[in-house]
């Protein structure tokens, strides 16, 4: 390959992009790390909680999400495609009649929304839903 100014610019630009991309971990692995930190590495059960999310969200700026978690003391929501995956935490007191929570979250792109519930007996339960976003809400 002949060393020209054009080849030098292309090579250096490609190298800079490759180095920059290596500095950022994948968002899904960030979510897994956050969940492991929350649960202390405990095994996650499924089926005891439900997450209510739209299959398709036309605008990622306001996506309605609901969680029903009977017997939970806390529920944390994660969006694995967002730059900061931890979205919200809801805590329930001993006198809470209904262990449900709802909010609107911002999603950058099509991704999984994961709810992790800490139950009264100290175990953890998981529920997830895939939300297809047509217009991203985090600068997308």
Where are these regions (language model features)?
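Surface-exposed, short loops/turns at beta-strand junctions within beta-sandwich domains
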Residues: 105-110
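Structural beta-strand segments of beta-rich domains
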Residues: 61-65
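Short beta-strand edge segments in extracellular beta-sheet folds
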Residues: 130-134
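C-terminal segment of N-terminal export signals and the immediately downstream linker at the start
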Residues: 22-55
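Short proline/glycine-enriched turn/loop motifs at strand-loop junctions of beta-rich domains
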Residues: 69-73
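Beta-strand signatures of extracellular beta-sandwich domains
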Residues: 76-78
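N-terminal secretory signal peptides and thylakoid transit peptides that target proteins
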Residues: 1-16
């Amino acid at each position: 390959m002949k060393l020209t100014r054009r080849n030098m610019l292309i090579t250096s630009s490609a190298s800079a992009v490759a180095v920059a991309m290596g500095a950022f971990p994948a968002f899904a692995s960030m979510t897994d790390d956050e969940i492991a930190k929350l649960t202390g590495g405990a095994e996650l059960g499924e089926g005891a909680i439900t997450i209510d999310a739209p299959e398709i969200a036309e605008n990622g700026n306001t996506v309605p999400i609901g969680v029903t978690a009977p017997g939970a003391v806390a529920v944390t929501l994660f969006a694995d495609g967002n730059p900061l995956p931890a979205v919200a935490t809801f805590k329930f007191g001993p006198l809470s009649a209904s262990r449900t929570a709802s909010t609107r979250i911002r999603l950058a792109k099509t991704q999984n929304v994961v709810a992790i519930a800490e139950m009264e007996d100290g175990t953890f339960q998981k529920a997830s839903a895939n939300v297809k976003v047509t217009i991203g809400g985090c600068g997308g």
